[in-house]
A protein has these predicted regions:
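Short, solvent-exposed, charged loop/turn and helix-capping segments
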Residues: 16-19, 94
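Acidic/histidine-rich alpha-helical segments that form the ligand environment
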Residues: 67-107, 115-128
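Short, contiguous alpha-helical
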Residues: 2-10, 18-65, 107-160
Length: 160
């Protein structure tokens, strides 16, 4: 699941122009660079929760605003750091026992840890949601310029 989500995200981020990276469909909407920054921050939090057993910010503890503010809006650097954190997370997850995963999930999510192994899949689900958001932004960007969408389902249940 993690490998599939990562490959889909990488595919969704291929061949981006600088304009497309920063484009917003509305002034209050997220741009792709903002989403990648968000994913980078959260990937580090997931890694820290799995690797050293710390509580998950925004869920079990308050978000460290000073640390968040220190992460610049630099698409290339954030994508690089996201990949490093995500890859490390998956490597550690592969080597983690179910008992340790259960313990780290409880530490990460506190009272929200009703799902015993949530730490093992939460990041992939979160990233998949934002991957869909990025694809939608890219399709809207192209549509606004009279170009065909780049992400069209190849599935007979969708009309042509």
């Amino acid at each position: 699941m993690h490998e599939l989500v990562w490959s889909r995200l990488k595919e969704a981020l291929e061949d981006l122009s600088q304009e497309e990276i920063h484009w917003r469909s509305l002034p209050q909407a997220n741009a792709i660079d903002v989403i990648v920054r968000h994913l980078r921050i959260e990937a580090q939090w997931h890694l820290d929760s799995l690797q050293i057993g710390v509580a998950m910010p925004t869920i079990a503890v308050a978000a460290p605003q000073e640390a968040i503010d220190a992460v610049p809006l630099d698409f290339e650097e954030n994508l690089k750091r996201l990949e490093e954190s995500y890859t490390r997370f998956v490597d550690i997850l592969r080597a983690t026992t179910l008992a340790t995963l259960r313990q780290r999930t409880a530490a990460a999510y506190g009272e929200m840890s009703r799902q015993t192994y949530r730490l093992g899949y939460h990041q992939a689900a979160h990233m998949a949601m934002h991957c869909g958001q990025i694809r939608m932004i890219r399709n809207l960007y192209r549509k606004m310029r009279g170009e065909p969408p780049g992400f069209v389902p190849d599935n007979p249940t969708y009309p042509k």
